[in-house]
């Protein structure tokens, strides 16, 4: 199975050589795609920046899904990864609800980032459970109006990482 993990540029972590996302996280006030369908060992997770630019891919090592009564309990599952310490990433999330936390491995930047996918409507995780959905999300397309700014910002961000 393949998945798309959507993250804002300011929540990206890693070096110029490789991403170090560590975890894919979905928290919602109602069950979302990751909570409903899960992710399993060796599933592919594509990393898309909010705005439509695909920049990396990883493999799922293990995934936890469940209900939570305090978002701090979800955050605790990411301890040791850079995302754990990004307060901005955790701010504004539902205080209680449904979550999925996928541990990522074999993270790599794409040699050529590409634009793809429909609007995300606030989702952080999408499961590509059919060929049609996979095509809809992964077939390259032209950047959106003003989208080249995101590509430039990503290149600057990645170039500035040690």
Predicted regions and their residues:
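Aromatic- and Lys/Arg-enriched surface recognition patch
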Residues: 54-55, 59-138
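Sparse, context-dependent recognition of short Cys/His-centered cofactor- or disulfide-binding micro-motifs
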Residues: 30, 45, 87-89
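Compositionally biased, charged N-terminal/linker segments
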Residues: 1-41, 48-51, 108-162
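Short, conserved beta-strand segments within well-ordered enzyme catalytic domains
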Residues: 46-48, 59
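Short beta-strand or tight-loop elements
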Residues: 41-43, 100
């Amino acid at each position: 199975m393949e998945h798309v993990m959507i993250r804002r540029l300011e929540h990206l972590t890693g070096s110029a050589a490789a991403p170090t996302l560590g975890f894919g996280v979905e928290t919602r006030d109602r069950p979302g795609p990751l909570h409903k369908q899960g992710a399993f060992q060796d599933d592919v997770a594509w990393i898309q920046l909010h705005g439509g630019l695909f920049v990396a891919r990883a493999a799922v090592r293990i995934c936890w899904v469940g209900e939570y009564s305090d978002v701090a309990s979800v955050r605790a599952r990411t301890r040791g990864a850079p995302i754990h310490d990004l307060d901005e990433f955790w701010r504004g999330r539902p205080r209680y609800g449904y979550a999925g936390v996928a541990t990522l491995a074999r993270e790599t930047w794409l040699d050529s980032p590409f634009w793809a996918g429909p609007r995300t409507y606030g989702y952080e995780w999408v499961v590509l459970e059919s060929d049609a959905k996979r095509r809809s999300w992964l077939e390259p397309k032209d950047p959106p109006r003003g989208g080249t700014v995101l590509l430039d910002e990503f290149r600057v961000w990645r170039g500035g990482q040690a």
